Amino acid sequence: MDAFIQKFCEKYSLPIALSLQLLDNMEKFTFHKGDFLVQEGGRNSNFYIVSKGIWRGHYLNDGVDVSVWFASEGEAIFSSWGYVENTVSLVSIEAMCDSELYGISKAKLEVLYAGSVELANFGRRLFEQQFLGLESWMITGGSPRAKERYLTLLEENPELLQYVPLKHIASYLWITPQSLSRCLLYTSPSPR
């Protein structure tokens, strides 16, 4: 079984058989580093699972690029505005490296939800996870120590440092790139 399927099942408490049923109804897409799934002001109401790569959700705030979330192998991504309300996205979703996604239209996914209580419950749990993730991001942004926020991110997503420019990680952590550099310096193993 592919590693991303295992991660997906664990993250969203979905039995493997149901995740495979979901994947059977999805189409595989390939993206290059810098490609967008949707740009701020654009529309995309589809639902995706990351099978390879890292993605970033971000927006511009008075000309400053602010990272809202990162997603990697086994995680779901979608434009909340496009998926829920079929309106323009307030967030751009960008590939941080060459990536693969499995995608399904909202209409097709809702047919699957209607035919399976377990899949419908998965949809509910997914949105609960999204809300918790957003709230956590907002709260940790107020955490008194940049180092603590950085260590938490490293624990949850260690692969980000390999693919995501430090300026994007810094904006996600609500710190300057200089503060992030200090965090990297203080947390890296000291030479012997």
Task: List the model feature ranges, each with a label.
Residues 8, 31-37:
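Amphipathic, Lys/Arg- and hydrophobic-enriched alpha-helical face
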Residues 36-97:
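Cyclic nucleotide-binding regulatory domains
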Residues 29-31, 71:
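Hydrophobic residues at beta-strand termini and immediately following loops
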Residues 94-177:
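Polybasic "coupling" helices that flank or enter modular domains
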Residues 1-27:
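Cyclic nucleotide-binding regulatory module and flanking cytosolic helices
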Residues 186-191:
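Conserved small/polar residues in nucleotide/adenosyl-binding loops
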Residues 1-4, 30, 105, 146:
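N-terminal alpha-helical segment
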